[in-house]
Amino acid sequence: MDNRVQIFDTTLRDGEQVPGCQLNTVEKIQIAKELESLGVDVIEAGFPVSSPGDFNSVIEISKAVTWPAICALTRAVDKDIDVAADALRYAKHKRIHTGIGTSDSHIKYKFNSTHEEILERAVHAVKYARKYVEDVEFYAEDAGRTDNEYLARVVEAVIKAGATVVNIPDTTGYCLPEEYGAKIKYLFEHVDGIDKAVISTHCHNDLGMATANTFEGIRNGARQVEVTINGVGERAGNTALEEIAMILKCHKDTDLYTNINTQKIYSLSRMVSNLMNMPVQPNKAIVGRNAFSHSSGIHQDGVLKNAQTYEIIDPKDIGLDENSIVLTARSGHAALKYRLETHGVNLSEEKLDKVYEEFLKLADKKKEINDDDILMLAGSERANDHHIKVDWLQATSGIGMKPVASIGLDISGEKFEAAATGNGPVDAAIHAVRQIIKKPVTLTEFTIQGVSKGSDDTCKVHMQVEHNGRIYYGFGASTDIVNASIEAYVDALNKFTAE
């Protein structure tokens, strides 16, 4: 059996299903190119039949990426497969990923069907997909809760029908590691012809066991893992690419390896976090802010003497360079451009000039500018295309006085001004915006997060608003909480006023 573990990245499909983290086609292409540079074997680019946006993204990613297989998801439905094949027409290496639910609950409640009918649909879908492409992956949705004997029948049948890869998803994140590993082992012991296909894992993190389950799958014979950058994904997320890659790199006694260039992990993690507006939790394994931080005096003493006393991973192995350029108000365009490019952010000269102007303003307030600061500045540049823009904002608040805010908006070139009071400066500023917009909008979620360490550092604000029964998300970043909040609120307003 091959000791190389293939990396199937589904950040752009399963990972993008997180509410508020949708990417446009340009952003998806940007991530896809970095995934190619990282060394992934397969990029699942989207679910083409689900929307014109996904269809177009698969087409454009197929054009932009050279050597990884480009995969398109479908249901076991002929039309889905037709559309997927069309979307993959420019891909150098095409894969169709089709499948159907196999657990008793899916068969009974989702499909109102029988085990035999589901088996027939699975075989038909694989054969139909093989008419278009040679590389067909079959997924047995909710395999984690599927009876092993029936699952083995399905796997054997789809391999005979032409499946080159068979995906065994723990769709609900229910399995225990030992249980999931035993399921993979059972398939290798009971499926005739299993050596003719690659067995793949796809684990969700609902009980915090996605990485452990994936590793047990590998130990028992799986040679493809389906993962996402930062573990992003529906509900509690998916297995994190960086965790599996570094587990295999650290535990060389397993004799298993990947083709991942681990030194590109950190920059891609930050890039995905920035483009998705989804912060990485500070204590996240491998890529979290605190992953290489030590607060205990005993730990600090040990690390200063020899890092191996408390660090099993060299930070440089994931692309963290202790000798990185320090950005200050004296830094020029070239330094800023270099630092952005190390995180996979490439801006036109015009946009770089605008980001540099904001960088200098921020640098006047802070002694040093960190990576999070410049990534926030680069991300906010995307807001320049909005037709509702904040010209100016003034908010006053203090002990014993009523918070007041005044604001000036530019709406498609027309100027508006308003003032309002509120329970605080943010509330007052939002009331002032509402006086101008005059649309029924309900603020349903409001989250403030400090990005860095100091009181003068950038904060990120995420807002969720409801308008006419639909949910819209907004994002803002600034060293000023009120400014960041209004930036997020206006960002959300631009989402539905553009429709």
Give the ranges of each region predicted by the language model.
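Short beta-alpha connecting loops at secondary-structure transitions
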Residues: 67, 169-171, 226-234, 249-258, ...
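A mid-to-C-terminal "edge-of-domain" accessory segment
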Residues: 4-5, 11, 246, 252-419, ...
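Short, ordered loop/turn segments at secondary-structure junctions
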Residues: 47-48, 73-76, 100-102, 141-143, ...
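Catalytic alpha/beta core domains of metabolic enzymes, predominantly
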Residues: 175, 182-305
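Non-catalytic terminal/interface segments that mediate subunit docking, oligomerization
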Residues: 17, 30-31, 368-472, 476-483
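Alpha/beta enzyme core
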Residues: 3-7, 17-42, 55-64, 78-199, ...
